[in-house]
């Protein structure tokens, strides 16, 4: 039987095409795509808090209460050990609404958190507060409002907290806002409250 060169080439090509799937089946690595690490989500929010407070019990705004919400963002510097990381604050924004029609406010600043144990922590805040309260001379301010002098005010806050688990924690808080004597009136506000927090 005489085989021509073109027919031999065609037979070889056909055999290669038919054998390719079988070769891939025999070699499992040929069917597995190259590994690609998963894309990690970039979260800038560190923690969300919600709570309430009693508005300055010793002032004209006593016997009123607030609802408070707060967002803490991720630290701008990471990779430090536990000790030095405590000195890097988390940028913070929040707001407090007085449900009885007295002074409400929004604020921004920085929060420092220090761990006492794995579950107990303390923290401090410093920043600025912007309010809708009364700023005029005390003589012209209604008896049920504090004379805050001006806006914005300095805001300082402190808290002690307990971590229930890796996500949830509870806190007792105190906050103070005033203008440090930079305006004519400076009654300020000192509020006491509590929060529940969720860490992302």
Which residues make up each language-model segment?
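Short coil turns and loop connectors of transmembrane beta-barrels in diderm outer membranes
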Residues: 44, 87, 102, 116-118, ...
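Solvent-exposed loop/turn segments connecting transmembrane beta-strands
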Residues: 56-64, 95-106, 116-118, 130, ...
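Outer-membrane beta-barrel translocator/channel fold
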Residues: 55, 123-157, 161
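Outer-membrane beta-barrel "beta-signal"
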Residues: 65-69, 189-200
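Repeated loop/turn-to-beta-strand initiation elements of outer-membrane beta-barrel proteins
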Residues: 76-81, 118-122, 166-170
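Membrane-embedded beta-strand positions of outer-membrane beta-barrel proteins
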Residues: 48-52, 91-95, 122-126, 156-160, ...
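Residue-level signature of outer-membrane beta-barrel architecture
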Residues: 71-75, 112-114, 162, 176, ...
